[in-house]
């Protein structure tokens, strides 16, 4: 997939990566992909860790509130985590609600968010999506955030 923003157009955007570390090894792989994509684009970033995917939207909201109160302003956000289906309905709740909350934040606050929260049936599927040499969803989420930053600037939002 081709993204719409070159390194020059970005003017060194500053992003916040919010990673859920429920599965540490998978989190490392997703973060590695996201960092590599942002480094390649010349972007800067901070990383904050949260317990699980449901905490990611709230953390982004905290960052937005903090910026309003003189804290760090971010041009965009990258959400990373893994939700693997188990034996209960919990998978559906976490998957649906984390995605819905990220979409709501993106639309209501007019912010750029790359969603790299994997929602998979098993660990094998997660690894295929997390590894840089495979689907590199961490890198994809970072590049998506950069694209949305570019579009936001293009439209003057």
From Swiss-Prot:
Binding positions for 5-amino-6-(D-ribitylamino)uracil per the UniProt entry: 22, 53-55, 82-84, 115
EC top class named in words: transferase
Induction: The two ribH genes may be differentially expressed during the Brucella infection cycle. Brucella would use RibH1 for flavin biosynthesis during the extracellular phase and RibH2 during intracellular growth.
Regions that span the bilayer: none
Source superkingdom: Bacteria
GO CC, any one term: riboflavin synthase complex
EC numbers: 2.5.1.78
One GO term of the biological process aspect: riboflavin biosynthetic process
Subunit architecture: Homopentamer.
The protein's name: 6,7-dimethyl-8-ribityllumazine synthase 1
Organism lineage: Bacteria, Pseudomonadati, Pseudomonadota, Alphaproteobacteria, Hyphomicrobiales
Gene this protein is translated from: ribH1
């Amino acid at each position: 997939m081709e993204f719409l923003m070159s390194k020059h157009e970005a003017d060194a955007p500053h992003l916040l990566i919010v990673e859920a570390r429920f599965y540490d090894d998978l989190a490392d792989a997703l973060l590695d992909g996201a960092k590599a994509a942002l480094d390649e684009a010349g972007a800067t970033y901070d990383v904050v860790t949260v317990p699980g995917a449901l905490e990611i939207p709230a953390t982004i909201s905290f960052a937005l509130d903090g910026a309003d109160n003189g804290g760090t302003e971010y041009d965009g956000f990258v959400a990373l985590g893994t939700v693997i289906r188990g034996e209960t309905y919990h998978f559906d709740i976490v998957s649906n609600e984390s995605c819905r909350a990220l979409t709501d934040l993106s639309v209501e606050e007019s912010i750029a968010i790359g969603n790299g929260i994997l929602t998979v049936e098993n660990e094998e599927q997660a690894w295929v999506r997390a590894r840089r040499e495979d689907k590199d969803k961490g890198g994809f989420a970072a590049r998506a955030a950069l694209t949305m930053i570019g579009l936001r600037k293009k439209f003057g939002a």
